[in-house]
Curated annotation (Swiss-Prot):
Highest rank taxon of the organism: Archaea
UniProt function note: Part of a complex that catalyzes the formation of methyl-coenzyme M and tetrahydromethanopterin from coenzyme M and methyl-tetrahydromethanopterin. This is an energy-conserving, sodium-ion translocating step.
Keyword check for Lipoprotein: no
GO cellular component, one term: plasma membrane
Similarity field: Belongs to the MtrF family.
Cellular localization per UniProt: Cell membrane
Gene (name only): mtrF
Organism: Methanopyrus kandleri (strain AV19 / DSM 6324 / JCM 9639 / NBRC 100938)
Other remarks on this protein: Unlike other orthologs, MtrF from M.kandleri is not located in the mtr operon.
Topology versus the membrane: Single-pass membrane protein
Quaternary structure (record): The complex is composed of 8 subunits; MtrA, MtrB, MtrC, MtrD, MtrE, MtrF, MtrG and MtrH.
Class of this enzyme: translocase
Pathway entry: One-carbon metabolism; methanogenesis from CO(2); methyl-coenzyme M from 5,10-methylene-5,6,7,8-tetrahydromethanopterin: step 2/2
Keyword vocabulary terms for this entry: Cell membrane, Membrane, Methanogenesis, Methyltransferase, One-carbon metabolism, Transferase, Translocase, Transmembrane, Transmembrane helix
Record's protein name: Tetrahydromethanopterin S-methyltransferase subunit F
Length: 75
């Protein structure tokens, strides 16, 4: 059971699985405590500290700057 928990933590934080679950728990909590910026609680997705709306904003910028002109030139 401890092995499955370690594998889960490896998926969440992108760190190697640790046999010592106490050390792994401490590591996960340290990462969560240090993942605050812009006055908001950052969420951990695939090992990256991602602001809640940063992905949406980047996607909109990508679509507006790159995809829309490309589509306009294609037609």
């Amino acid at each position: 059971m401890a092995e499955e928990g370690s594998e889960l933590k490896e998926v969440i934080i992108g760190a190697p699985a640790m046999a010592d679950t106490d050390r792994a728990d401490t590591y996960v909590n340290d990462v969560r405590d240090s993942s605050q910026f812009f006055g908001r609680d950052a969420r951990l997705y695939f090992g990256l500290n991602v602001n809640r709306f940063a992905g949406l904003a980047c996607g909109m910028v990508f679509a507006g700057v790159l995809l829309v002109p490309l589509l306009l030139l294609a037609f």
